[in-house]
Every structure is written in structure tokens, then in C-alpha cells.
């Protein structure tokens, strides 16, 4: 991983422009910390595909925030990815699988659709960070992920780094973050 020591923006530039041109996507939840990475990617290349998993369980505020960030950052290829309706009908006919089996819900609403969406890409960009804890504490900047390479440009960022980036870049906050 010859680019593993670069700062986040430099790592993104290397991955997007040199290592995987036209073969890399960003996966984003458009959640509370997402604007930082979306902004960084848009600064390198606003045409990079952004994969948004529309699970059918998201708050309206998240969808509004997604739309606002797309416009503000000039993102030109945001792809709303949905679970397969037939798979949902089989696995979660009542729409309450999340309350009975969160792992199965995540599988049908996120894992399977993401795998389909990543077909045709060699690499993808993730906003995961070590400070989120658990199995992320040992997160590296570049990792193998099955048939793909996963780029984690914010792996070493702290909460303060995120706050500073939002302030310096004057990024809007997620409406639910603002509500506490």
C-alpha cells in the first residue's frame, strides 16, 4: 500500500486519479459525518459515483440532506441503491425485520444491494474511522475487501478533525445532528 501514509485528500487524489480512474466509487450514508468525505471527493472529482443505500428505513431529513449536499457539492453521479423488492417481500414482508433480527435486516437492505452496486468497480471509498471503536480500532487506510480494494481516507481522523473540517469548509450539518 504505497499510498498508506498520505493525508486523506492526497490519498483520495491518488486513488481516484492514479490508481483506479473510472473504477472507484464512494459509498455514503449521507449521515451526520458524511459531508466531510463527500466534500473531499467533490474537490478531487465531482463525477466520482456516489452509492447511497436507500434502505427504505431512512428519515426524511436524511433524504433532504442528501439532496442539499448533492447540489452544494456539485456531485453529478449519486446512485440511489434500493433493496430488491422480491428479496424484501421474502425476508421482511412486514417491514419489521430490524426489530427481530438486525443482522438479517442489514444483510437484505445493505449488504446485498451494496454488493450489486459495486459490480464493475475495482475499489470503493468508505468514511469509516477508528474512533468509532469496535472492530474499527485497527482500521487501515487501504484494505482488501473481497474482490475490491477499500479506501478509508478518514481512518485516522478524530472527532476534532471532523469538527475542524466542517468549520473550515463551512459545511452544513445534518438536520438530525442539529436537533441533538
Per-segment meaning from a language model:
Residues 1-180:
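Nucleotide-activated chemistry modules centered on ATP-dependent adenylation/adenylyltransferase
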